[in-house]
Amino acid sequence: MNEEQRKASSVDVLAERDKKAEKDYSKYFEHVYQPPNLKEAKKRGKQEVRYNRDFQIDEKYRGMGNERTFLIKTYGCQMNAHDTEVIAGILEALGYQATTDINTADVILINTCAIRENAENKVFSEIGNLKHLKKERPDILIGVCGCMSQEESVVNKILKSYQNVDMIFGTHNIHHLPEILEEAYLSKAMVVEVWSKEGDVIENLPKVREGNIKAWVNIMYGCDKFCTYCIVPFTRGKERSRRPEDIIDEVRELAREGYKEITLLGQNVNSYGKDLQDIEYDLGDLLQAISKIAIPRVRFTTSHPWDFTDHMIDVISEGGNIVPHIHLPVQSGNNAVLKIMGRKYTRESYLDLVKRIKDRIPNVALTTDIIVGYPNESEEQFEETLTLYDEVGFEHAYTYLYSQRDGTPAAKMKDNVPLDVKKERLQRLNKKVGHYSQIAMSKYEGQTVTVLCEGSSKKDDQVLAGYTDKNKLVNFKAPKEMIGKLVEVRIDEAKQYSLNGSFVKEEEPEMVIQ
């Protein structure tokens, strides 16, 4: 949605709000730009998505942050981590300097996650903890951004109960941060600017990347799948793909800067290119193009089984810098549960996809996500998830108890699965996850593997740590000069979720920048 469309739609949004007194935020505060609306967020229009490659910060805002510092606390997924890099880039362009000391920061931003209730509770606790800081230093600015900001209930709760917050902005208008900051400095009221409809694709946004070894590369925004449990299609908007030439240019620049690994990001990367009306171009085509660039490792996340094509499998099977690790969320192994989840595939079709992947990529490492305790999940249905895990032999899984999200269809479903039953099932599933992880890890004992050394181990500063191409954590002793390099490590010990090894040598570079 471009600027003109946003202004026009905001009239309709505000008119709708006038009909509903319980959502009239103005009775609490003087000035609100635009509050979120989940009903509006669900609509998927055919408005043209504009590509803005000329983003510039107005000169009048430059210097706003001189002699001021900022701190960003980030919760949630890789997309949020990427957004934080952009927010930090904008703040530094305004003159702010990053700090790790929350007690001295002049601007504190909390980049939030809405995927599970636990994440939201942590954010509200964090906001509450900042109340005393606001009393001690009333001139600081406290802001809430990210996916939680796109939820009406969250914004309403902040407006009513957390008056230490100065500004709220969403996922679609990060590029408006200079204007939002200026308004927050000038206004006595809380500033809220949350676009319920997605915005243009803004290129050339400044970024402050976390480190110089690995980088996030966003390839698309939003999700149109509307799984019944998921709030993301509401908080991130409809699917919008970046132009391939813009992505490829960014990857080439990262190669020139010496990055060793990139991860292509999207809520559903497999849908990449479907909305590009002037060309036929999908994720397989993009991976093929990037495979010719001198980035040693290329990952992508997150994949939806529905959109995983044979073309993609073929490209990954060619090897090169596309790693043989595929994260393929299954969520459940029972067809009835998958149907009410709105996952658009069956147990049988998922297993068929796994077979096609394994046939063409024999050395592939498959990992997954699983939700336990979906509304009315029976013991028999849960056991089908366990048997599917056995059939696939996943090397790892991220497992979760079902978390109700207001505004999703699943929130209206009656749930008769007691919490203690859900926890017991999760425990059984995690036991299986650990079992198969140990099997996968044990195969590495005695082998020499290539590891991207990322830094010191979290548990021992004298030990270095990094990951294999299949995302296995490896701990080993080596000179600190190896940080940021690809090295060969002989595996001496396989633990359940990590490997211990001995440094052999630095790997020789093979690729040439295209």
From Swiss-Prot:
The UniProt note on the cofactor reads as follows: Binds 2 [4Fe-4S] clusters. One cluster is coordinated with 3 cysteines and an exchangeable S-adenosyl-L-methionine.
Return the EC number.
2.8.4.3
Cofactor requirements of the protein = [4Fe-4S] cluster
Catalyzes what?
N(6)-dimethylallyladenosine(37) in tRNA + (sulfur carrier)-SH + AH2 + 2 S-adenosyl-L-methionine = 2-methylsulfanyl-N(6)-dimethylallyladenosine(37) in tRNA + (sulfur carrier)-H + 5'-deoxyadenosine + L-methionine + A + S-adenosyl-L-homocysteine + 2 H(+)
Q: Tell me where in this chain the TRAM domain is found.
A: 442-505
Q: Look up the domain of life of the source.
A: Bacteria
Entry binding sites for [4Fe-4S] cluster 2: C223, C227, C230
**Functional description taken from the UniProt entry:** Catalyzes the methylthiolation of N6-(dimethylallyl)adenosine (i(6)A), leading to the formation of 2-methylthio-N6-(dimethylallyl)adenosine (ms(2)i(6)A) at position 37 in tRNAs that read codons beginning with uridine.
Name it. Answer: tRNA-2-methylthio-N(6)-dimethylallyladenosine synthase
Organism of origin:
Staphylococcus aureus (strain bovine RF122 / ET3-1)
